[in-house]
């Protein structure tokens, strides 16, 4: 995880060095300058314990071992101090996963707040402690939580320091245009470049910026697909 943080920091330094060259190259510090606001943490819990599986069945009304839809989306624990959520996709997810194993994805938006069962912030917790907090919120009896978390789950936590950097507060000009004025062999691609009307956090956004860059720099006479006007489309609004 330290390696992930270092990579993010190095990218931010690189982007800042580029931005120094011209005001039209944006302000990357708006997106990578406050890790306390842009981070959240997730964990993968693997278990085959029948007590835990039974609690999952009660919540989802489905058997997670059938290979069919399980949670059908994200399950949010709205009374969680961490704002903890979890989901189970169709099992098995991995080639080497055993047939009786279930993989649960758990994440939290508030990593700096003490938990309800584990009185520590998520960012300071081990995988076992994160599991204990999750078991508490799915209704496992309190006197069974620690033993189940320690001996019947294998949990891998992952801290993502820049996961919501896309959504940090910004102003016009903080994201550079795909092809800044005057550029003939240089363009910005991806989620931190500015393209009209579209919304970041989608693959389409990144693809659209790449198309704009290639068509614009190479003089390709081809239109970039329009952004779907869902905000004004009654079919979507309904």
Positions of PLM-derived features:
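Single conserved hydrophobic/aromatic residue that forms the stacking wall/gate
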Residues: 1-8, 12-15
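Conserved flavin/dinucleotide-binding core of flavoenzymes
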Residues: 21-238
């Amino acid at each position: 995880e330290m390696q992930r943080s270092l990579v993010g920091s190095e990218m931010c330094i690189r982007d800042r060095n580029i931005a120094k060259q011209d005001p039209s190259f944006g302000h990357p510090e708006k997106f990578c300058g406050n890790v306390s606001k842009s981070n959240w943490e997730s964990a993968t819990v693997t278990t085959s314990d029948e007590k835990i599986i039974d609690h999952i069945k009660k919540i989802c009304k489905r058997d997670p071992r059938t290979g069919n839809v399980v949670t059908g989306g994200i399950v949010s624990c709205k009374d969680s101090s961490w704002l903890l959520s979890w989901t189970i996709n169709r099992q098995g997810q991995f080639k080497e996963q055993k047939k009786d194993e279930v993989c649960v994805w758990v994440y939290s938006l508030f990593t700096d707040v003490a938990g309800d069962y584990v009185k520590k912030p998520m960012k300071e917790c081990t995988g076992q402690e994160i599991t204990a907090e999750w078991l508490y919120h799915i209704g496992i009896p309190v006197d069974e939580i620690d033993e189940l978390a320690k001996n019947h789950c294998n949990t891998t936590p992952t801290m993502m320091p820049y996961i919501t950097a896309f959504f940090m507060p910004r102003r016009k000009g903080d994201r550079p245009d795909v092809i800044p004025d005057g550029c003939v062999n240089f363009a910005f691609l991806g989620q931190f470049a500015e393209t009209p009307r579209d919304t970041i956090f989608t693959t389409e956004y990144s693809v659209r910026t790449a198309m704009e860059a290639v068509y614009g720099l190479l003089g390709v006479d081809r239109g970039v697909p329009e952004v779907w006007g869902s905000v004004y489309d009654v079919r979507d609004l309904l």
